[in-house]
Amino acid sequence: MANSLLEGVFAEVKEPCSLPMLSVDMENKENGSVGVKNSMENGRPPDPADWAVMDVVNYFRTVGFEEQASAFQEQEIDGKSLLLMTRNDVLTGLQLKLGPALKIYEYHVKPLQTKHLKNNSS
């Protein structure tokens, strides 16, 4: 039953490959991680830590979360805040429906955090 629930949740995942802001390489690595490449587009800084609240809102609008994007504005989530968010913050703090919240965290917030950490650890 748990597997069928998860399959249903992930069945309608928005493809991060079509991000206008990021040039995303969705090639799966051996460990299951995803490579993400960055480029400046739509006037947003390439580093999410430099995003203003409206950059975050526009990012989520462009990746298919039009309804949910307003929650980031209401909670005043800028790039630095976005990079600090935990799974629990996204699932409960934004008061979003569970399905979209899971997708937002797993396919957008988490990869942005991972990319940011990689770029700033060297």
Swiss-Prot record:
Residues 51-119 form the SAM domain. InterPro entries: PcG_chromatin_remod_factors, SAM, SAM/pointed_sf. PANTHER family: ATHERIN-RELATED, POLYCOMB GROUP PROTEIN. This is Sterile alpha motif domain-containing protein 13. The gene is SAMD13.
